Design a protein with these regions (language model features):
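Histone-fold recognition with a strong bias for associated Lys/Arg-rich disordered tails
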Residues: 2-173
Length: 173
């Protein structure tokens, strides 16, 4: 896997996070880091001043067809398009910031995202992985008390079923 460089935008919002939050590109797989870099753009599309968990989730689901996040959800019996629509509906209901004649730049990590990223450390240990991957981001999102648990519940995807799907896609079933 190639090494991607951090964009200034990603570096800014990630630097605002707490000390125990992984924020260096070198700690992520390429696909996971790609989602982290896309999340601020997703947040901006929804007029959010903060990058939050739903923005990372949507960035994961908007990755090219055949992406790992979609394969995991499909393995769990959830259509990725449905998951994306649910996350978009959630994001559309959140407070928005508007700038006359301009666009909002989402450059700060929200509290739930900071918590979710901290959770990725536990997920990487659970699977004994060196790098934070798409699977870890999905698993940590499902634990998010702000919106992840609600979205996953609406999709009929409890934690045990998600973990089983991750294990199966990883070839550990």
């Amino acid at each position: 896997a190639g090494v991607a460089r951090s964009s200034p935008r990603t570096a800014r919002w990630a630097a605002a996070a707490a000390e125990d939050v992984p924020r260096e590109r070198e700690k992520f797989t390429d696909a996971a880091w790609s989602a982290m870099e896309e999340a601020p753009k997703v947040a901006e599309r929804f007029g959010s001043q903060y990058v939050e968990t739903e923005h990372v989730f949507m960035a994961l689901l908007e990755q090219p067809t055949g992406a790992l996040s979609a394969r995991i959800l499909e393995k769990a019996g959830v259509k990725s398009a449905t998951a994306l629509a649910n996350a978009q509906a959630w994001a559309a209901k959140q407070p928005k910031v508007s700038v006359p004649g301009g666009t909002v730049e989402a450059s700060s990590a929200g509290r739930s995202l900071v918590t979710m990223l901290t959770e990725t450390n536990g997920a990487s240990k659970l699977w004994k992985d060196k790098y934070i991957s798409v699977e870890h981001l999905l698993f940590a999102f499902a634990k998010d008390t702000r919106c992840g648990q609600k979205i996953m519940q609406d999709l009929g995807l409890p934690m045990d079923k998600l973990k089983k799907a991750i294990d199966e896609v990883r070839g550990k079933s």
